[in-house]
Amino acid sequence: MIPAIFLMGPTASGKTELAVRLADALPIDIISVDSLLVYRHFDIGSAKPSLALRQQYPHALVDIREPDEPYSAGLFREDALHCIALARERGRIPLLVGGTGLYFRALECGIDTLPPANPALRQSLMALAETAGWPALHQRLATLDPEAAAGIAPHDRQRIQRALEIILGSGQTISGARHWQGTFPGPLYKIILRPPRSWLHQRITQRFDVMLNEGFLDEIADLSARHYAPELPAMRAVGYRQYFTWHDGLCSAAEAYQAALAATRQLAKRQDTWFKRESAHYYLDPSRDDASSLLLQMATRPRQGEVHSIGWDNG
């Protein structure tokens, strides 16, 4: 059976560029693993591959939902498994590319089972958040379960609420309460991008400047005119959330810019923390000039489950 390849890494680490270069050399079907790219209309601020690029290098699971349509790790797993099967039927390599760690985990390990919602506890947490604020509840989460808190932004109300609900209701950490059910069909090889932090921060700034030049503020105005509910996941996404605040007149453009950069760096840090906990066959420094050729080596050389650090010093 044709192996699937996971290409994982933090935001702005060059995943798309590397994926299309690999597609120039191998018969590859690119499958997006990104919880924001599934939504239509969120194009510039998400760094969604351009329509022209996607016409040349099709990306599955991009623009498959309206922003107010629900989507989840479970639905992603169903969609991705279907795309993988289609690629293999055509004799092509499924290349799954993205930075949404939970989607990768769900695809590889199946869907996690967690305790059901507790309405009374949820109401109590909501009331506490009204008075203390979500960052305070995030600090409480960090005390109870540092690992879970490290992967959740201080203003991510939905995930903070759910995490505290599980911990306080079950008396267990998230990892202790979580049980994954499922397996991945066929062989799988994982490649994790590990960029130098200074290089990644520079890329984040450069990419954000490009977004602004490409019309990100117009995109914010267009999305605001569509009157989507502010609590929708896409509306709370990094970059968008900060500029919706600006659009509503609650901060200056300079403040929104700095807040968006800081939030994007924090997102990259959380993603890096997640991927450090993942096992992989290969690790790659994408800042190297020969990163594309090294990736091709990783995708084609024989493997027997061994771990390689090609082009990356883990010392």
Curated annotation (Swiss-Prot):
Its EC number is 2.5.1.75. Keywords: ATP-binding, Magnesium, Nucleotide-binding, Transferase, tRNA processing. It is an enzyme of class 2 (transferase). It comes from the Bacteria. InterPro entries: Dimethylallyltransferase, IPT, P-loop_NTPase. Residues 34-37, 158-162 are annotated as: Interaction with substrate tRNA. ATP binds at residues 9-16. The record marks 100, 122 as: Interaction with substrate tRNA. Transmembrane segments: none annotated. NCBIfam families: miaA. Monomer. This is tRNA dimethylallyltransferase. The lineage of its organism: Bacteria, Pseudomonadati, Pseudomonadota, Acidithiobacillia, Acidithiobacillales.
